[in-house]
Amino acid sequence: MEELDRSRAFARDVKRIVVKVGTAVVTGKGGRLALGRLGALCEQLAELNSDGFEVILVSSGAVGLGRQRLRYRQLVNSSFADLQKPQTELDGKACAGVGQSSLMAYYETMFDQLDVTAAQLLVNDSSFRDKDFRKQLNETVKSMLDLRVIPIFNENDAISTRRAPYQDSSGIFWDNDSLAALLALELKADLLILLSDVEGLYTGPPSDPNSKLIHTFVKEKHQDEITFGDKSRLGRGGMTAKVKAAVNAAYAGIPVIITSGYSAENIDKVLRGLRVGTLFHQDARLWAPITDSNARDMAVAARESSRKLQALSSEDRKKILLDIADALEANVTTIKAENELDVASAQEAGLEESMVARLVMTPGKISSLAASVRKLADMEDPIGRVLKKTEVADGLVLEKTSSPLGVLLIVFESRPDALVQIASLAIRSGNGLLLKGGKEARRSNAILHKVITDAIPETVGGKLIGLVTSREEIPDLLKLDDVIDLVIPRGSNKLVTQIKNTTKIPVLGHADGICHVYVDKACDTDMAKRIVSDAKLDYPAACNAMETLLVHKDLEQNAVLNELIFALQSNGVTLYGGPRASKILNIPEARSFNHEYCAKACTVEVVEDVYGAIDHIHRHGSAHTDCIVTEDHEVAELFLRQVDSAAVFHNASTRFSDGFRFGLGAEVGVSTGRIHARGPVGVEGLLTTRWIMRGKGQVVDGDNGIVYTHQDIPIQA
């Protein structure tokens, strides 16, 4: 669902384009040509050529292709004894000479099939020092472009006088980013496109889920914020080289976009002015606002505020809604004034009467909205209701309770009253909310959002409800499947279809099992050892097995921590520690807290208290099953109430998180997702369920010695 980006509008008017294809795009995993990607690239360039664009291609790949051919020839001509000898590295210049003809032969074959003529031009950096060379280069390229020929440039590595090595420790290809930037400047290109193996420039390694894609690079803002990861598996410089080349070209007046060469349509999207990849532009620092992080920050803030909302009492949540209703009526004049500006703009723009009618916010409609909010406030609190209570076994009680979904993203069209309805439903159901209304109601939505968020107490925060003001932010939000739980598009079928096709987030319209056991300072030691051992050892590969053991810091002093560790290690469990536990226990540090071992191994970490455990689970858990072992009832209830997982247990092994053991019959799977509602969605449709289990130290132990009763317990009103 890419949208036109105003800062990219210039791309629709370019004529001369330099496209550089990186080695990681040219080749596949085995070092061979990626025929599918290159074929798609040639088709895009041929289409641009026929549409009147002047296309110049800079392609890497010769060294690698030559190395592959020479190695094959060596293998064919080697005896068995030769193969046992250490293999020497092939000379990069020889590889370049052999591979260049193969690379060009492929391009000629592909372009011939597309009825396009291509030409090869090999250059060296020293040549550009010659003024006559640069003049002749421009004349030759101009003649080719006038004849609709696509020039294909590469550095002439075979006779290059560079002293730098022609290979690195991780790959086989050379890099042409600086050559592409140089050619773009020398040939007066309107745009340089650098095709990479990632979507663009990220704030950190692209594999890191916390890394954010930078849409517009601002040197003053981003230069010190970026952490580069490993360079390309094949190329010489990777993203570092691309950024340096892009900055040099952009500050000299040539706009640059780094984007993925893996998508067959990205060049076309760039030229349509869509927001793909990372833009480098000499005027970028003058554009405001720079909103690269707004989408994620807004979603994370909504989630944090929703947890604060859920922690309030039922009466306090009710009061928020009543205050909102009062605020709506108190601000009728202001709301009406802003709404009239929207209506006037819509009429001036020639919108259909039916759409204009939906825009209108009369005093009567505002009063009606306030009344509906009060009615919602008077409803029974939907959060934390016990829906079912079961005695699983003697002394082991299971409750099914209602719980908020989390963070909702609602995309709706030109009905400002929908904002009030959706916001009040979200607050009643304890959810964080992000809203994107139609541009026709921009002023109305803004004032309604302000009135509502001003009525939310500081203990929760106005960021509970975020208002998305630009369509350009929607694609970013749709990528945030780690912080947004449900998308509800309210609009045309096209809108719903577009969103469904461009997001991993569940869409309501027309996993990992990283389970935690937290052992509190008030635990029964023997019970803790039984539960921890059972949670890890009863079936280590199960998704409900313990993967992380969290221990209260006080247990280090009274030797309980050592007893828990011994119980695991004596049964063959390999332990890895967090930063704190690895030093205390002298065990290897875990690579990540977000790791599911599915084996006789787990992570151990020491936390300050129950709040530290809850925070750790929220940051590193998968919302599957988490358990607390404690004799402190208040601490247990705090944990059960605040841990936002599908199943939360007190004094019971995580292995009980199973359809059969819950008395549900056969199990299809364990879902950590939250989508479930069908039909008209009110408060109930914005809720999910959680399982709360209270036990007395029971363990599964292969179901030996436990009698399942599965008796329904009456729910007290």
UniProtKB/Swiss-Prot annotation:
SUPFAM superfamilies: ALDH-like, Carbamate kinase-like. GO terms for molecular function: ATP binding; delta1-pyrroline-5-carboxylate synthetase activity; glutamate 5-kinase activity; glutamate-5-semialdehyde dehydrogenase activity. Residues 1-296 are annotated as: Glutamate 5-kinase. GO terms for biological process: hyperosmotic salinity response; L-proline biosynthetic process; pollen development; proline biosynthetic process; response to oxidative stress; response to salt stress; response to water deprivation; root development. It catalyses: L-glutamate + ATP = L-glutamyl 5-phosphate + ADP; L-glutamate 5-semialdehyde + phosphate + NADP(+) = L-glutamyl 5-phosphate + NADPH + H(+). Its EC number is 2.7.2.11, 1.2.1.41. Substrate binds at S60, D157, N176. Residues 297-717 are annotated as: Gamma-glutamyl phosphate reductase. In the N-terminal section; belongs to the glutamate 5-kinase family. NCBIfam families: P5CS, PRK00197.1, proA, proB. P5CS plays a key role in proline biosynthesis, leading to osmoregulation in plants. This is Delta-1-pyrroline-5-carboxylate synthase A. It comes from Arabidopsis thaliana. The lineage of its organism: Eukaryota, Viridiplantae, Streptophyta, Embryophyta, Tracheophyta.
